[in-house]
């Protein structure tokens, strides 16, 4: 503060020069308001906001891969030797968000590692595909022990949150697999559903993100529709849809309903728990290349290949709205979040699930999935050239982004979970930020 004089008064003659008199009485009244004004101007007088902590940087090579779940980060080192059929993989498991090394696993498989899941008690489930024929396989490993606890030629679909049962499937083909419920610690088969019994199988769409369905819906060869417990394999409800089975008969499960479509002729909806019929209407409800999503109070349908988004009324099956021009989308806490990621400048938009109208647009940002609190989403933007990253939290209610931090020299590959953000850097290392 330049050119400001403060009157300290005068020292009376004959008194010590160390004594400081009181401020002159006429000006004392202004000190209170002046102090208040300075506090307001300085933002409340508190300390300035602190920048986000520096990330934990883990050196990796370009051939190393990473897998992220809710509380673990797995680093899959490049297989040794490269290009052979039998490959030796080293997997390091880190605790999140502290990045403490927990265990190291050594896996010998005939191919590449596709999936990793924590089974509990230090056991790690590893899913792989055979490099020669593409057949799936799953092994459960102990730390620092290349001998599997068990191995089976199955592909992992999901594991229950309490780690008590896993859902897997195996040959003879991708269209007609054998579905199995298994004990993840021992590999014992708890129940099976053979392809000779069923024509089609589907699960509620929510399980694609949660990782495990509580119910499985099957259209049997004899024309019956049934619901099974994914934990026990027990059939809990059954019904026989009207009309004969056809080659184009298909089933889906979303929004509390199981939909049975008979080509372009008819669609019937059933309750997901009881299979009681809810409604029936002529024509298709689900397009051939559609994917249902639960965005209650409606059922949203994403069309593959950038075909846009639409929504139907779960009470009647009537088409409510359609929004074109979006190539990706997701439903977070009932909010429809769509994106235009194929454009030079990515953009997000929030749609009203009842009408499909655009509530707000968020240019330049990419969704990172459900955020730290209900009604929020993680978002980030990566500027190239420049390799500059910004990340934050999107409020799905008002469309505003709260910036959390920035970073330089980021190549991409960013992933969020509830605790961290992980991104690849230009030197192939990964940076891990606490959120």
What is the meaning of each model-derived region?
Residues 1-435:
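Secretory-pathway ectodomains
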């Amino acid at each position: 503060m330049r050119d400001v004089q403060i009157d300290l008064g005068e020292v009376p003659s004959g008194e010590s020069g160390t004594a400081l008199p009181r401020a002159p009485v006429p000006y004392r009244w202004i000190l209170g308001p002046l102090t208040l004004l300075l506090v307001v101007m300085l933002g409340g007088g508190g300390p300035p906001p602190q920048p986000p902590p520096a990330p934990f940087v883990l050196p990796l090579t370009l051939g190393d891969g990473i897998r992220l779940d809710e509380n673990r980060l797995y680093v899959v080192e490049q297989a040794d030797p490269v290009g052979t059929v039998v490959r030796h993989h080293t997997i390091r498991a880190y605790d999140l968000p502290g990045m403490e090394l927990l265990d190291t696993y050594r896996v010998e498989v005939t191919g590449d590692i596709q999936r990793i899941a924590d089974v509990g008690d230090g056991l790690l489930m590893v899913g792989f595909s055979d490099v020669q024929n593409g057949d799936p396989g799953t092994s459960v490993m102990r730390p620092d022990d290349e001998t599997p606890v068990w191995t089976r030629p199955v592909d992992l679909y999901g594991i229950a949150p309490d780690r008590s049962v896993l859902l897997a499937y195996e040959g003879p083909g991708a269209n007609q697999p054998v579905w199995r419920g298994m004990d993840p610690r021992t590999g014992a088969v708890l129940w099976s559903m053979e392809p000779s019994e069923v024509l089609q199988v589907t699960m509620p769409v929510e399980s694609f993100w949660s990782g495990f369905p509580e119910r499985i819906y099957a259209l049997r060869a004899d024309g019956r529709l049934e619901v099974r417990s994914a934990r026990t394999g027990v059939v809990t409800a059954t019904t026989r849809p009207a009309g004969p089975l056809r080659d184009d008969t298909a089933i889906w499960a979303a929004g509390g309903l199981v939909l049975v479509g008979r080509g372009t002729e008819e669609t019937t909806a059933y309750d997901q728990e009881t299979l009681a019929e809810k409604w029936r209407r002529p024509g298709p409800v689900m397009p051939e290349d559609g994917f249902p999503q639960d965005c209650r109070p409606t059922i949203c349908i994403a069309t593959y290949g950038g075909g846009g988004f639409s929504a139907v009324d779960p009470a009647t099956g009537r088409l409510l709205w359609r929004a074109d021009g979006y190539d990706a989308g997701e439903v977070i806490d009932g909010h429809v979040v769509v994106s235009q990621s194929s454009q030079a400048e990515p953009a997000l938009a929030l749609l009203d699930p009842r009408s499909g109208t655009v509530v707000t647009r968020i240019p330049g940002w990419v969704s990172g999935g459900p955020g730290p609190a209900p009604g929020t989403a993680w978002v980030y933007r990566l500027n190239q050239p420049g390799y500059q990253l910004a990340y934050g939290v999107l409020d799905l209610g008002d469309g505003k982004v709260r910036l959390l931090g920035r970073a330089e020299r980021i190549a991409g590959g960013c992933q969020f979970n509830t605790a961290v953000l992980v991104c690849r850097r230009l030197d192939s290392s990964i940076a891990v930020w606490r959120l």
